[in-house]
Curated annotation (Swiss-Prot):
<dbReference type="Pfam" id="PF02843">
    <property type="entry name" value="GARS_C"/>
</dbReference>
<protein>
    <recommendedName>
        <fullName>Phosphoribosylamine--glycine ligase</fullName>
        <ecNumber>6.3.4.13</ecNumber>
    </recommendedName>
</protein>
<comment type="similarity">
    <text>Belongs to the GARS family.</text>
</comment>
<dbReference type="GO" id="GO:0009113">
    <property type="term" value="P:purine nucleobase biosynthetic process"/>
</dbReference>
<dbReference type="Pfam" id="PF02844">
    <property type="entry name" value="GARS_N"/>
</dbReference>
<dbReference type="InterPro" id="IPR011761">
    <property type="entry name" value="ATP-grasp"/>
</dbReference>
<keyword id="KW-0460">Magnesium</keyword>
<dbReference type="InterPro" id="IPR037123">
    <property type="entry name" value="PRibGlycinamide_synth_C_sf"/>
</dbReference>
<dbReference type="GO" id="GO:0046872">
    <property type="term" value="F:metal ion binding"/>
</dbReference>
<feature type="binding site">
    <location>
        <position position="273"/>
    </location>
    <ligand>
        <name>Mg(2+) 1</name>
    </ligand>
</feature>
<feature type="binding site">
    <location>
        <position position="285"/>
    </location>
    <ligand>
        <name>Mn(2+) 2</name>
    </ligand>
</feature>
<dbReference type="InterPro" id="IPR020559">
    <property type="entry name" value="PRibGlycinamide_synth_CS"/>
</dbReference>
<feature type="binding site">
    <location>
        <position position="285"/>
    </location>
    <ligand>
        <name>Mg(2+) 2</name>
    </ligand>
</feature>
<dbReference type="Pfam" id="PF01071">
    <property type="entry name" value="GARS_A"/>
</dbReference>
<feature type="binding site">
    <location>
        <position position="287"/>
    </location>
    <ligand>
        <name>Mn(2+) 2</name>
    </ligand>
</feature>
<keyword id="KW-0067">ATP-binding</keyword>
<dbReference type="InterPro" id="IPR020561">
    <property type="entry name" value="PRibGlycinamid_synth_ATP-grasp"/>
</dbReference>
Length: 430
């Protein structure tokens, strides 16, 4: 059956979403993005170049195109209420309403929801609304804290005591952002990502993924939106036991049930970022959409019709039989401008070489007269797929190394050495 789908967003995540939808030749794609993503544009029937939060322009475009459904990529339009407005116009969405999106956009709401419903995995926390309250708690707390702005930060706004700042630095950072912060116990362990399709009641998990936030090899340098990620052929990670996986899945299932019980049912993609600690998985945060880069890992493995999954989520009858992933490993490597993230060099030309069997996803890149140029954020990503992690990494690394220009990437993502480092760290904690 023909289906017209609106895709909102223009990054690498949205290119992955668009490609997955386009695997069904009966699906017609219409796109809204602030800047033209050449990969998305080539797969779209029509493109509206407009800021994704400019809902007054998005709604008429969607209705004029006659779309049957929308898929929302980034978090900002969710916070702006794009799903509510689309549904008022008769267009259902893969994405939560503004109220349900608070699971990501309001960290205080998220923690209080978990506390009210007795959901496991919630770290010790304190919500502060002014700098003086934050100062008193930071200075009196026995241990290190994570200082988190209550609202959206693009994944780059958290300061961790003992890693980024000391006590005085934490107090100053809380003051700089106005004192509206969530202060949480610093979690020690290994991070992992569990994403799931959610129809308001039913939750179908995707393969586990591990992202790499630090800019440089060896996990050093400033935090970024994510330099790359990997997943294994068994859809697990070697430092996450089956028991800990089941605990994380239960936390997400309980969170969806809590949202439904409070009258704000959650429909869309639920992204759980967990720290696997000595006590088991703890929730670092929830996101109300696919991760970037993690979307590229899981959607590169999706064997089911993505448009069909969207339809089942909208209808509220999602079942495990609707979702199937290939039993393969994936490695995603982002190329970023020289100087990223602090002083990225924009407007530098790029040349793609022979990238073999890798999948290419365009992100913050501009095509002018047939030549690609860097912008100020992550440029493009390659995903390698293979029977083993080593095979997938070799495909991704060969592709990433084929690009010439003022860009760099982390060569260590997906290598046996970095995986063993993660496992050794987990063994030391336990």
């Amino acid at each position: 059956m023909d289906m017209k789908v609106l895709v909102v967003g223009g990054g690498g995540r949205e290119h992955a979403i668009t490609r997955a939808l386009s695997c069904n030749s009966d699906t017609k794609i219409f796109s809204v993005m602030a800047r033209k993503n050449p990969g998305i544009a080539r797969l779209s029937e029509r493109v509206l170049l407009e800021k994704e939060t400019n809902i007054e322009k998005v709604i008429p475009f969607a209705t004029n195109c006659g779309v049957d459904a929308a898929v929302i990529g980034p978090e900002a339009p969710l916070e702006a209420g794009i799903v509510d407005r689309l549904e008022a116009a008769g267009i259902p969405s893969l994405g939560p309403t503004r109220a349900a999106a608070r699971i990501e956009t309001d960290k205080a709401f998220c923690r209080r929801l978990m506390e009210r419903h007795g959901i496991a995995g919630c770290p010790e926390y304190r919500v502060c609304r002014d700098p003086e309250e934050a100062r008193r708690f930071i200075e009196s707390y026995d241990g290190d804290l994570a200082v988190k702005p209550i609202g959206l930060t693009g994944g780059k706004g958290v300061r961790i005591m003992g890693e980024h700042v000391d006590v005085a630095g934490a107090v100053e950072y809380a003051r700089e952002i106005g004192g509206s912060v969530v202060l949480e116990e610093r979690l020690v362990g290994e991070e992992f990502t569990l994403q799931a399709f959610v129809d308001g009641e039913h939750l179908i998990p995707m393969p586990l993924v591990q992202d790499h936030k630090r800019a440089y090899e060896g996990d050093v340098g400033p935090n970024t939106g994510g330099m790359g990620s990997y997943s294994l052929a068994d859809h697990m990670l070697p430092f996450v036991s089956r028991r800990d996986y089941e605990k994380a899945l239960r936390i997400m299932t309980d969170t969806v049930a809590a949202m439904r019980a409070e009258g704000t049912p959650y429909r869309g993609i639920l992204y759980g970022q967990f720290m696997n600690t000595r006590e088991g998985p703890k929730v670092i945060e929830f996101n109300a959409r696919f991760g970037d880069p993690e979307a590229m890992n899981v959607l590169s493995l999706l064997e089911s019709d993505f448009a069909g999954i969207v339809g089942h989520i909208i209808e509220g009858d999602l079942a495990p039989s609707h979702v199937r992933f290939a039993k393969k490993a994936t490695v995603c490597k982002y190329l970023v401008p020289e100087g990223y993230p602090d002083a990225p060099r924009a407007n530098e030309p790029l040349t793609l070489g022979d990238y073999g069997d890798a999948l290419l996803y365009y992100a913050s890149v501009e095509e002018r007269d047939g030549t690609l140029h860097t912008l100020t954020s992550r440029t493009l990503a390659f995903v390698g797929r293979g029977e083993t992690l080593e095979e997938a990494e070799a495909i991704a690394e060969k592709a990433a190394s084929s690009v010439s220009g003022s860009v760099f990437h982390r060569r260590d993502i997906g290598t046996p050495e970095i995986l063993e480092k993660r496992c050794q760290h987990m063994r030391e904690i336990l």
